[in-house]
Amino acid sequence: MTTLTITRPDDWHLHLRDGDVLTDTVRDSGRYNGRALIMPNLVPPVITTEQALSYRERIQAVNSSNTFAPIMSLYLTEKTTSDEIRKAKATGYIVAAKLYPAGATTNSDSGVSDVQKVYPILKTMQEEGMLLLIHGEVTTHDIDIFDREKTFLDTVLAPIVNDFPELKIVLEHITTKDAADFVKNAGPNVAATITAHHLLFNRNHMLVGGIKPHFYCLPILKRNTHQLALIEAATSGSPKFFLGTDSAPHSKEKKEAACGCAGSYTAHASIELYTEVFENEGKLDNLEAFASFNGPDFYNLPRNTDTITLVKEAWITPETMSFGNDVVVPIRAGEAVEWLVK
């Protein structure tokens, strides 16, 4: 039987939601991750240090794993203050602030409409060593949804990188060759997370033979040429790319609707799905760096010291999984996953 032992991985982009669903989402993500960076786009958004620490307490209250720890982030708004950034940084639990362009994704209505308005905050973040996480899409209606990431790189991200060269920036859940190339060519303070579903799927999986709502996420799946570029970047061994699932659960009812929510649930099998990608590319030797080393190295945090073991043993993903009082349909529902964490 084929086995693979790696340093315990981390998830640098995770949505746990809030309320009664936390019991399920924390269980799934805590099964083998050492740490997870928790996204702040709740309703209302996590915009203050107190809100972030309170959210962390709610997560920890249902966290039964002694190897899993949540890392928190703030939701950046045009009203965020420099004092709030300093206060958050001083806690030791909040390591980043997330820039959501207003209207770009789930619960992003409180996001930033004009990046220039948060430039004073970015200056403070650069001084304090607080990382900037970015959902990299423009939201103007004249830009096609498949082009919003590329346009963001040219019009928003490039000026930020130029104006704040010492600010550490993570371009989250990249979906295009353009984004992968931007990160590769940028300086050492720019990195990116890549999801399992953007490595495994392209827009044909979502649209051919009928609409598959559980593949609908933001940024949206792109054509296969972009998928191949993401696979190359993720498996390359470059320290600029690391694991961030963007596992984003919604109830089955909210996904299978006339106006369905954006987000795919992969926390139930994230490392197993990434392992498939690396195996298919003949790059299993690079999985540990992508999953376990590059993230903490970029965040200036220690690597995990324990390990997990994956076994090449197929198992069938449940059709649905518990999600508070509802159910969530996970990626690969009813289908085989080729690796299993023992």
Swiss-Prot record:
One cellular-component annotation, GO: cytosol
Positions with a binding annotation for Zn(2+) 2: 98, 135, 173
Gene: pyrC
Cofactor(s) recorded in Swiss-Prot or TrEMBL: Zn(2+)
Reaction catalyzed: (S)-dihydroorotate + H2O = N-carbamoyl-L-aspartate + H(+)
Record NCBIfam families: pyrC_dimer
Source superkingdom: Bacteria
Name of the protein in its database record: Dihydroorotase
InterPro entries the UniProt entry points to: Amidohydro-rel, DHOdimr, Dihydroorotase_CS, Metal_Hydrolase
Keyword field contains Metal-binding: yes
The protein's assembly and partners: Homodimer.
EC number: 3.5.2.3
Pathway as given in its UniProt record: Pyrimidine metabolism; UMP biosynthesis via de novo pathway; (S)-dihydroorotate from bicarbonate: step 3/3
Record GO biological process: 'de novo' pyrimidine nucleobase biosynthetic process; 'de novo' UMP biosynthetic process
Entry note: cofactor: Binds 2 Zn(2+) ions per subunit.
Catalytic residue positions: 246
CDD domains found in the cross-reference section: DHOase
Family statement drawn from the similarity comment of this UniProt entry: Belongs to the metallo-dependent hydrolases superfamily. DHOase family. Class II DHOase subfamily.
Residues that bind Zn(2+) 1: 13, 15, 98, 246
Function: Catalyzes the reversible cyclization of carbamoyl aspartate to dihydroorotate.
Binding-site list for substrate: 15-17, 41, 135, 218, 250, 262
Enzyme class name: hydrolase
PROSITE patterns: DIHYDROOROTASE_1, DIHYDROOROTASE_2
Keywords assigned by UniProt, alphabetized: Hydrolase, Metal-binding, Pyrimidine biosynthesis, Zinc
N6-carboxylysine PTM sites in chain numbering: 98
Coiled coil location: none
